[in-house]
């Protein structure tokens, strides 16, 4: 898969979580902040990143930088996805279903951020298993990256879309 040039995209960023993490040392606890950010252009490109620093703004900046390096392209059919899929990562499973126009984004928490920034306006989703934000986001992106349009499948098989759909 080729890397997506983020300089040509108008990316919007959304902060999903900021966690305070502690390292216990002899003199007490040392606190740092871990940020989780999703970026997307609302036109089929989305990515996520994590950043860790001693200050919150710096952690967010690092997370945004990381997210811009991990962009994926989402195949879309109008305002939804081509077919149903279950994204899996660790113990987190996310069911993604195409929806008819006007349905809106039916998703919870971190999954909603990913789907909205990808530009999907009509989609149903259900989070199964782990509810850890990072696992949910990774499962969603894994599912979105495995989607295929009917045209792409037909081309791979050397058939027309009409032959494929019967």
UniProtKB/Swiss-Prot annotation:
It comes from the Bacteria. GO terms for cellular component: small ribosomal subunit. Keywords: Ribonucleoprotein, Ribosomal protein, RNA-binding, rRNA-binding. InterPro entries: Ribosomal_Su5_D2-typ_SF (IPR020568), Ribosomal_uS5 (IPR000851), Ribosomal_uS5_bac-type (IPR005712), Ribosomal_uS5_C (IPR005324), Ribosomal_uS5_N (IPR013810), Ribosomal_uS5_N_CS (IPR018192), Ribsml_uS5_D2-typ_fold_subgr (IPR014721). The keyword Cell membrane does not apply. Residues 11-74 form the S5 DRBM domain. It holds the Pfam family Ribosomal_S5_C. GO terms for biological process: translation. One of its GO terms (molecular function) is structural constituent of ribosome. Part of the 30S ribosomal subunit. Contacts proteins S4 and S8. Belongs to the universal ribosomal protein uS5 family. The N-terminal domain interacts with the head of the 30S subunit; the C-terminal domain interacts with the body and contacts protein S4. The interaction surface between S4 and S5 is involved in control of translational fidelity. With S4 and S12 plays an important role in translational accuracy. This is Small ribosomal subunit protein uS5. The gene is rpsE.
């Amino acid at each position: 898969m080729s890397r997506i040039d983020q300089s040509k995209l108008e990316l919007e960023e959304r902060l999903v979580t900021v966690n305070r993490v502690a390292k216990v040392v002899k003199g007490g606890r040392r606190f740092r902040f871990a940020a989780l950010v999703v970026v997307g252009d609302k036109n089929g490109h989305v990515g996520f990143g994590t950043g860790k620093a001693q200050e919150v703004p710096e952690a967010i900046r690092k997370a945004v930088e990381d997210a811009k390096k991990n962009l994926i392209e989402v195949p879309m059919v109008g305002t939804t996805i081509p077919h149903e899929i279950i994204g899996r990562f660790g113990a987190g499973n996310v069911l993604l279903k195409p929806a008819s126009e006007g349905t809106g984004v039916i998703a919870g928490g971190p999954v909603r951020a990913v789907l909205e920034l990808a530009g999907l306006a009509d989609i149903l989703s259900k989070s199964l298993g782990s509810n850890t934000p990072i696992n949910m986001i990774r499962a969603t992106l894994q599912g979105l990256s495995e989607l295929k349009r009917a045209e792409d499948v037909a081309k791979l098989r050397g058939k027309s879309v009409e032959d494929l759909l019967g």
